[in-house]
Amino acid sequence: MERALVNLRRLVVTIVVALTFASPAAAASIHITNDSSMPDAEIADALPAFQRALDQDFAPNWHEARGSELVLGEAPPGAWEIRIVNSPECLLCSGYHDLDNGVPYAVVSTVDDWQVTFSHELWEILVNPYLDRVAIVKPKTLTRVYALETADPVEGERFVYVRPSASGKPVQISDFVTPAWFRGDSLGPWDFSGATKRPLQLLEDGYQIWLHNGAWDALYASKGAKAEGRAKARRWNLHRRTIAHISGALAG
């Protein structure tokens, strides 16, 4: 245990000393490709709601997302992409975001509430596109390294909100945490919907990926979130996202 604590302290010092704190800008355009059986018209109808949520809700809190535009259609080489599929190639998840030859992309399944999954992955790819950003957080007297993922801590259908589609239909939008959520002494707001009552709080189905004894693990608020959180941690470990890969940190 003592050795693990020493290693963690060394890791934190390395991150704080070596890393830049600048936020990467998101792509000017994120292309939405439909590889599912869902009609293109359904996606096109919902797209203005996602764009409005991005511009009016998310970007004012996470400035790196400013100016990003959602475009329905095939992605040219090198473009960021969100792929909508019938079933994702991942265990215990309805969506995920990753890199394809260094290019950020996300996959969204139509199996569950695709609108919530879409906005969840959108929020995360905008802030942590290369899966290399972390937050140095200090719950109580501890110091931890959290993956900078903006929708996982407040995951859950109870916490979604609604924006109108082009035709006026309600589109469900995932809640997201603000930068203040990662700062233990902040006054808030800590998430867009106002569901969290303190920094670092995990809501009922929420989880958080964190660095534990040199490997990525998951903190979770309930048994229901345990499986999904640990599945995501396994994906991070599979890609060996360790200190060698981390390039940007948010101080807590």
Language-model region placement:
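Short alpha-helix carrying the canonical HExxH Zn2+-binding catalytic motif
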Residues: 111-123
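Acidic, glycine-rich loop-and-strand cores that form catalytic or ligand-binding grooves
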Residues: 121-123, 128-131
